[in-house]
Amino acid sequence: MVDLMVPANDDPSNETDYSRSNNNHTHIVSDMRPTSAAFLHQKRHSSSSHNDTPESSFAKRRVPGIVDPVGKGFIDGITNSQISAQNTPSKTDDASRRPSISRKVMESTPQVKTSSIPTMDVPKSPYYVNRTMLARNMKVVSRDTYEDNANPQMRADEPLVASNGIYSNSQPQSQVTLSDIRRAPVVAASPPPMIRQLPSAQPNQTFIKKLQEIYKIIVVQETELQQRCLYLTTSQTTELKSLWAIYRLNTELIKNYINFIITALLTTQPINDLIMGQEILDIYRIEKRLWVYGIITFLDVLKNFSNFMDPEVCCQFIIYAFISVSNMLEDIPLKYSILWRQRLGDLSRMAISLYPSGFIDWRLSAEYWYTESMKYIYGCGKLYYHIATVQQNSLEAFVNLGKSVFCQDPFTPSQQTLQLLIENIYQSAFIDRSSGSANNNEIAHRNSQLIDYLKHTEVMLLPSFLENMDLQHVVLMYFKDKFGKDFNGNDVFDTKDMFCQNPESLRYYFRHAPAFAESQLLQLIGFGNPKNPFALLFQLPKYLKLKKDKREKKRSEATETSSYTDPFDVQISSESYFQNIDALNSSFNDIPTNLNIWLDSLNHINMTSIQCSIHVLTKFLHAPLVVALPHFLTWLHFIVAILKKLEMVNSKQVVAFWIHFLRRTMPWNSIVTLGNVLVCYMLDNLHPFLKKELEKFYSLELDDLIEYYNENENLPEIWKCWGTLWFDAIKKCDVMEIPGVQDHLFFDSPLDGIVFDEKDEVGEKFWMRSVRAVLLLKGIAKKFPDLGLKVSFQASVFCRRNDIPPDYFLKNLTFKLDAYDEDNYNDNNELDDLYDTIEINEEIEAVNMDPQATPNLSVVSGESIFEYTGYTRLAPDYHCFDKNGGFNSAFIYSQWSNVGNGVTLDVSGESIYDVANNNLSLHWEKIFFDKIAAASKGSDENYNCTLYFVIDATSWLRHFAHIFKLAKNNTLKFAICLTTFQELRYLRGSKDDTVVEAATRSVITIRQLYDEKKIIPMRFTGNIATHVEENLEFEEQITWKTHVDEFVIDAIAKLNQRFQAERLTDENKNKGKEFAVLVTDDDNMNQKAKDRMIKTCNTKYLFSLGSKLGINSGLCTN
């Protein structure tokens, strides 16, 4: 019989051979392991909620009729004819209830002697370690840290996911010698026999035997490790030799845990084995045991010794555990790696105090792994809190701190701890400003703006803030007058300059716009204050009560009886309700319907925070549209979340309370005006992509629209709201193996806000945001008419384009508001207290209440965005590129460089071409650029214009590689005068080495392009040459070296004449237009060409055109 249980050696002086087995069974002291007789279908461990079912249905669901579920004891001993004995599970302590996840093994374990330190490939830690900080960082990972996330039963129901690799060394080492470190004997005991039912379809016996062999080693090592740790703790010894001995044993145990996990999850094995391996992992809680017994147990011991020990042991152990677990992630399915990502963040955070940042930056490691886990784990307050302690971006850290106290599983720090972390976040931003000022003035200024914002935001969380009127006034004035202004006095929120802002400012406020919105919302909802009206609406007390009950259940798990909680009466008095919030004695499963509770909750709201939040929102509504939308969309979803929660309220009085609250608080006049401006702006920029987006979603109702985006989210600012308690009203998130995200690129967004990616650069995501904002407003107006927001189809929408049909749906879509009536739903003056507390934020203009009035064209009354300086249609043009054709970031949204040069662009009515002087003016260049780009999008058959660029010799010398790439990708068509080619050949004999090299490479490039038929050689006469190496004409024209420019210009003129003559012939009447353009940066040559009526452009224009065509075709042209 093959028995999983390991034989014990009663003699501690003898070596223990883990590779041998006999009929003796070792007594199991692990709370996670079975310890008495049990049947296969017995009830699982009673202390965890996921073990309430008698058996797992995973195997039956995944492969019906093939593999029955396994019970505890399955791998304790299996043969073809015998069933091994197995113990019944016993009650576990707090340490045993941990999450169940799986991972990979280290290929080698450092050899450790009791008389010396282990020879690991890591440097020693510095001796000046702050031991107090070490103890504090180790303390945060306690034995009950991960119990809340453990749910192996749930994971068993998930689909099978293939791992990314194969563990190549799944065989355990046959012998492990530990006699040199043994201190306490392992007591042997024989469990009673047990009869149980085997699966109907037997898994591979080799597979089971392999797991049994590994498990035998694990059982003995677990027992011995716990006994040695207990002995070391109770003996109060400070001998480092004992610590290193336990270290050696612990690293071997970690190796075997991971070996077991990898073997069980090996995806190349038969499906029956794979399913069985997953079941075994869950039932035997191997992953929990790896974390609890393999890592946390020893760290607890080290924590107790942190004040008088060399930190080398702790350093080595954390690094070993980190490397082992991180390697394991490569070889296991994603669903088994999610929580291990969070644990890698924990290990990194514990190591921060052990090494200085210049040596190993564990802070960056912790932030990375916490960020990785946040892609799949939502609503975990402890995770948000932990990343807030290590995050580099101070604003994002502040937001995550706010989310940690306002989510499904809220973190509940003391007020002192919360204030301390807020102070640390502010100090971190201050340090960043000091370091940035020495390197970059722009970065230093941005950091200063961020510090000012955080300073005035965080001060509102001080307990004394509400009592200090002067401080409230200072904070209010900052958000009203100073927020958004730089050191030069430029205001990014100045509406008149919305199309000529500094692109750097646009990108900065774009990236941080969602974080500004989230931080203000977290202030608005009380930053974790459960008595705040928003906290009551989103039921924060309910989740605080669940958190408390879970903690108490752990403490009182010795008793089988569960405590009964009386349901709370939603009509109870206000005083009793708030007293219960303090005590958390009753449940809060329902939203209160007693109006007095809501009126009294106004006493627990920070009115200054409301005013500051609305000031910031109003500023963003007046900002450049690309900056306004990420901020505005966050607020729109917050409004939708409130309205969806109100659908659950059965009291008309409470609904009326919130409707009046929203009508008085939100800047509805600016919101409606911005919605109408977006409609006009979309009409002026209507193009196929925008049309497709509108037609795809226009007919959807609000619920359908939200449901679609919940499963196909493509905006990072909305994804960042996932997990907050208020967003749970829209999409409730927990742990998701495959999040409902359409654009996974924003998972890789920078630490400094959301990413401004390629789709933002070309305006694609701008139109996605615009469409969503307009349709969300439309959906709110239709689904919640009591809010006062209306959609009118009676008013005409301003449109400057004649090519849009008059019956197009956008031309009749306008947003309007009902006049606000305080007496509505207030028959008995019940809401007078609300009116006294909340003032009306913004008066509604008459144009926004008249359903037939043409809406405003700007959020500033009486103005029009089409008349603002720098207004252009949103499309990449010539001015969005630099001299090398590189795309200038954010220039599509701003004409800042042109306005700075005294140029005002208005493309609404310019002429295309100035025939008199043949000058490609700025206006003509833009339209010519767009027309050529548009013509080049199709295939050769659809071209209505074929353009050949003829490049002079100087441009060839400077840009031959760039030209080669454009021609090689068929992005543009090129021709070359034989004169230019001969000049380049001649320059190979120059005395300047740089010229010689450039000329040589140019000649090679031209020959290669000619061989690939990517360039057309052109004679003096304008005819096409038979070969690029022709030289007959040069022999006849001996003066060509002194008249190169004239020969080139004359050849282009004759070529264009030839093209024109060919179009006039009968057989070529349907042929597309062809002409040649000279490309030169030489002003003299440029003027000579214009005198001959030849179109010219510079290399910047050429490369800009190539870049735009490359964007359209998905090609790299530089």
UniProtKB/Swiss-Prot annotation:
This is EST/SMG-like protein 1. SMART domains: PINc. It comes from the Eukaryota. May be involved in the regulation of gene expression responses of environment-sensing pathways. One of its GO terms (cellular component) is telomerase holoenzyme complex. Residues 1-62, 77-119 are annotated as: Disordered. Residues 15-27, 78-90, 108-118 have a biased composition (Polar residues). InterPro entries: Est1/Ebs1-like, PIN_dom, TPR-like_helical_dom_sf. The modification Phosphoserine is found at S170, S190. Pfam families: PIN_4.
